């Protein structure tokens, strides 16, 4: 549908990365200060890793690793706290968050990594790089498809879990 966003195989219009989504470094939150009984997800470079009772960002966004784990991209549609090991979207310019998450996965931000010991991703290295510019209508169509696939995956997973429970019950009946 969109083609390779690095090579722009569909010859789509392009713009600077920062015009599609502006990223910023996350915020410090020491482990001892986290309120694990909170309902706000805390995102680090490797995804949601804790909970807290205060959000630093309202309304959802896209998160990727800045230090350590580079290249994985996550999104949330709710409030969250991005840690200092991550970069998060401070301005999506009205673009769809789900679309942006998949776009950034395919854009391969790890290409811009620096450092040998602990890899680091500096937003200034890619903010002015060209990236495809896709209409909001196409983004929304794509996001609806992703949501439907995720909903189907969840239904299949639930069915598998129910089958596993049934199997255990039958095994208990046969061998118990």
Task: List the predicted regions and their residue ranges.
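Non-catalytic DNA-recognition/assembly elements of restriction-modification systems
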Residues: 1-44, 128, 133-140, 147-176
């Amino acid at each position: 549908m969109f083609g390779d966003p690095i090579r722009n195989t569909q010859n789509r219009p392009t713009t600077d990365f920062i015009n599609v989504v502006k990223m910023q470094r996350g915020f410090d939150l020491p482990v001892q200060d986290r309120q694990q009984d909170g309902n706000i997800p805390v995102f680090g470079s490797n995804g949601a890793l804790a909970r807290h009772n205060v959000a630093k960002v309202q309304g959802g966004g896209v998160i990727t690793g800045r230090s350590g784990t580079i290249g994985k991209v996550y999104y949330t549609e709710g409030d969250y706290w991005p840690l200092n090991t991550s970069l998060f979207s401070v301005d999506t310019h009205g673009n769809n968050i789900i679309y942006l998450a998949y776009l950034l996965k395919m854009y391969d931000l790890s290409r811009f990594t620096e450092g040998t010991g602990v890899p680091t991703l500096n937003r200034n290295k890619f903010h002015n790089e060209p990236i495809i510019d896709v209409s909001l209508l196409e983004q929304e169509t794509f996001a609806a498809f992703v949501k439907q696939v995720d909903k189907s995956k969840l239904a299949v997973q639930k069915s598998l879990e129910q089958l596993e429970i049934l199997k255990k019950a039958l095994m208990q009946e046969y061998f118990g």
